[in-house]
């Protein structure tokens, strides 16, 4: 394991250098405002939870809907538009979503983002032992707001797919630094699962991040553009989560759109 750790950090250092050179070469022909665009984020970003927003009867109905569509082993990610529509039938969720979105737009307007796209991007994420390639993959979202709605949990333990949230937010991001970060994360995602797992567990032990315990029926709000996060793996059962992303400020030169299409297929 010691040799694996040394190899991991050596590969990470070499990959970072190659990635930075590649990104600079790729972007040398881009001029003007696009590289100088910077988004600044307040220090008070934190995950917020809203308990008992969605009736458990609605959660059960949604899980039956998922079973009917995909069977016992739905693919790791699907468009969650239909599920989001089912949630919006409830007045409490609908009003909460509207309030959170209004607050996010007001925050974005203060930093000069008044023309954010209004279309939400809902994704159904189903994690199991067949989707380990998606586990322990730290990343930042492309969107300023994410609502996380747990639909079904896996058995409790270290392999239950919990969300892992890093404590230190990034507060100032340019298009170039964001693209470089996405490429670096992509290289880390290509590492073996055992290495990615060790890295996550190490960060948990030293306090760089924390596990977020969730429960079906509650709604969780966070700024995934500012807060790095990942998910533990799921070895038994299946964990189902609806993620609704809002307000992509366009700091990825189209890279996020390409990756998004690849995930949803």
Regions found by a protein language model. Give the residues of each.
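Flexible, solvent-exposed coil segments and beta strand-coil junctions
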Residues: 125-127
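Catalytic core of non-heme Fe(II) oxygenases with the double-stranded beta-helix
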Residues: 129-216
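Catalytic core of Fe(II)/2-oxoglutarate
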Residues: 174, 178, 185-265
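Short hydrophobic/aromatic beta-strand or adjacent loop that forms the aromatic wall/cage
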Residues: 45, 144, 239-241
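A short coil-to-beta-strand element that immediately follows conserved catalytic motifs
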Residues: 111-123
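A structural signal for short, well-ordered beta-strand segments
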Residues: 122, 147-149, 242-246
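N-terminal auxiliary "cap/dimerization" subdomain that precedes the catalytic jelly-roll/cupin core
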Residues: 1-104, 218, 254-265
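Soluble, non-transmembrane catalytic domains of enzymes that act on hydrophobic metabolites at membranes
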Residues: 5-9, 16-18, 70-73, 133-138, ...
């Amino acid at each position: 394991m010691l040799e694996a750790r040394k190899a991991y950090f050596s590969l990470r250092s070499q990959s970072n250098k190659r990635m930075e050179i590649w990104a600079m070469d790729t972007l040398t022909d881009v001029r003007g405002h696009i590289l100088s665009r910077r988004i600044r984020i307040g220090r008070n970003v934190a995950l917020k939870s809203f308990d008992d927003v969605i009736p458990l009867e609605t959660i059960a109905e949604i899980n039956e809907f998922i079973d009917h569509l995909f069977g016992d082993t739905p693919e790791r990610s699907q468009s969650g538009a239909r599920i989001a529509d089912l949630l919006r039938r409830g007045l409490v969720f609908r009003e909460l979503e509207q309030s959170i979105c209004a607050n996010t737009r007001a925050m974005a307007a203060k930093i000069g983002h008044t023309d954010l796209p209004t279309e939400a991007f809902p994704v159904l994420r189903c994690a199991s032992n067949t989707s380990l390639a998606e586990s322990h993959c730290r990343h930042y979202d492309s969107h300023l707001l994410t609502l996380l709605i747990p639909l079904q949990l896996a058995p409790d333990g270290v392999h239950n797919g919990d969300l892992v949230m890093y404590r230190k937010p990034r507060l100032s991001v340019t298009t170039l630094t964001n693209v470089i970060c996405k490429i670096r994360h992509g290289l880390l995602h290509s590492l073996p699962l055992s290495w990615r797992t060790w890295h996550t567990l190490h960060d948990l032990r030293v306090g760089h991040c924390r596990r977020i315990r969730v429960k079906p029926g509650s709604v969780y709000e966070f700024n995934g553009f500012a807060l790095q996060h990942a998910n533990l793996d799921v070895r038994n059962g299946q964990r189902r989560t609806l993620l609704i992303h809002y307000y992509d400020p366009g700091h990825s030169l189209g890279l996020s759109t390409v990756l998004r299409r690849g995930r949803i297929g």
